[in-house]
Amino acid sequence: MSEIAEVVPKIIEAIFSSVQEPFKTFNITIKPLENSRSFWSECYQILVTPNSEAHADKVVSPIFVKIPRISAINAACDPDNADENMEILRTLTAQEVTFYSDFSGIQFSGFPIPRSYYGENLGNEKMAGLACEDYSGKVYSIDFVPGFDESQVLQLLEALAHFHAKIIEISDEIPWKNYENVLYDAAYIRMLHNDTLDFEKLCPAELSGRIQEVKHAFDEDGVRNSEKKNEKLGMPLVICHNDLNASNVLWNNETGKIQAFIDFQHVSKGPVSFDIIRILCLGLSVENRRANTQRYLNHYYTTFKSHFSTAPFTFSQLEESYRTHFNFVNATSLFSLSYYYKMYKDESLDLKSGADEREHKAQEILRRTIGILDDM
């Protein structure tokens, strides 16, 4: 990222619209986040200090700004599909802006999300972007490898349980029409399958034919079929993050607790097991996942049912939901794993790790991929 996008200063002016000439009233630094692991969007940190005490109470800082411009990682991993990816990014941007707008007045106890300062989708393309609370210096994120430790997995499942319970509680207030999963249409699922097939070429000894064998999991009508299966199980629909991997959870430096869930670009309605499957399959070793799935599901359910005099579904229904939706959720997860494998193999995309560490991470991603394929 060599230059600051034109829209960023305009977003700053919109955030500080109650102040005349904010770039004169405040000292404002715009920092491109060149090493951001954001796959889709271009990201910035905004630092603001007042020029005088008279405006100190107007300061909001630091601020995280994300704009719908294809990131360097996306461009490097998928150089041949820039136009197609930009159209996807339009959809993702609109969905995240909608989420922050719809839920801005609701407190999700136990499921923290950043405070939103600004949101505009591509209906107003010149001003499109999102600005949120920035936690720099207070938080850390973890890598796909090693992934979540025991304490983190339990915290994540508790947080999801609290979130799902709240969503069910306020279900009548939610504009569900805004959360149709329009992204996962037939064309998008075909694209996921075709791109994931490249994983076979990258690792022919381990994966030759393996992605092709599970083509059935890349169900082009998977969203509707998942909802039908969910209804047959007698389960409620909830709001799903749909991209709940390690990079989208921020952890407090001092307490080790969850500080915030971020990046709601893929958010939609869906079964309660969708995000649970992603956490366990993307964030854990194969051995850990297989040995502890039932225990982790039970931990989620214990927290979830504590919100109700009579829970809206049983533990057996939750287990069946996990099994029922495992294949479709992991079809989209395989796509993510293939891109992280490419990233770890490319020194220019993982600047923090040495060659040996990058190779170790790539091999662990491959092991998780094989484990998922074996279980589909």
From Swiss-Prot:
Keyword Transferase included in the entry's annotation: yes
Signal sequence residues: none
InterPro entries membership: CHK_kinase-like, Dhs-27, Kinase-like_dom_sf, Oxido-Kinase-like_Enzymes
Record-linked Pfam families: DUF1679 (PF07914)
MF annotations from Gene Ontology: kinase activity
The keyword Transferase is annotated on this UniProt entry: yes
Keywords, alphabetical: Kinase, Transferase
UniProt xrefs under Gene3D superfamilies: 3.90.1200.10
Similarity annotation: Belongs to the choline/ethanolamine kinase family.
Name under which the protein is recorded: Uncharacterized kinase-like protein D1044.1
Organism: Caenorhabditis elegans
